[in-house]
């Protein structure tokens, strides 16, 4: 994958995260604050915990840091998959955001 292809796919992921936060805020009382700065999105929860998602362009990876730990994802077969085999990005974001918010939240690629 070229750098340009990576950036195209990664931008779609970051946009889906931002739109997911907006949708969640419109339909729940979660009160997520999503801030975008270049290739990074920081989601802050009312309890002040955060999830940080950022691009690692040289590695063609997306990194996510949450209270549960740090995770690295690569695009494989159209999905962002954990480099250690621990699942897919949006499933992990859903899991960690739900834990950190204390309520069920759902993120998806679309």
Swiss-Prot record:
Gene3D superfamilies: Frataxin/CyaY. Keywords: Iron, Metal-binding. The keyword NAD does not apply. It comes from the Bacteria. One of its GO terms (molecular function) is ferrous iron binding. PROSITE patterns: FRATAXIN_1, FRATAXIN_2. Pfam families: Frataxin_Cyay. GO terms for biological process: iron-sulfur cluster assembly. One of its GO terms (cellular component) is cytosol. InterPro entries: CyaY, Frataxin/CyaY, Frataxin/CyaY_sf, Frataxin_CS. Involved in iron-sulfur (Fe-S) cluster assembly. May act as a regulator of Fe-S biogenesis. Belongs to the frataxin family. This is Iron-sulfur cluster assembly protein CyaY. It comes from Paracidovorax citrulli (strain AAC00-1). The lineage of its organism: Bacteria, Pseudomonadati, Pseudomonadota, Betaproteobacteria, Burkholderiales.
């Amino acid at each position: 994958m070229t750098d340009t292809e990576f950036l195209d796919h990664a931008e779609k992921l970051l946009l889906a995260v931002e739109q997911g936060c907006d949708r969640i805020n419109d339909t729940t009382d979660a009160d997520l604050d999503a801030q975008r700065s270049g290739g990074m999105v920081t989601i802050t929860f009312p309890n002040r915990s955060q999830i940080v998602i950022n691009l690692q362009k040289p590695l063609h990876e997306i990194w996510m840091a949450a209270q549960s730990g740090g995770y690295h994802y690569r695009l494989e077969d159209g999905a962002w998959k954990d480099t250690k085999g621990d699942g897919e990005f949006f499933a992990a974001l859903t899991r960690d955001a739900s834990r950190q918010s204390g309520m069920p939240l759902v993120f998806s690629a679309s």
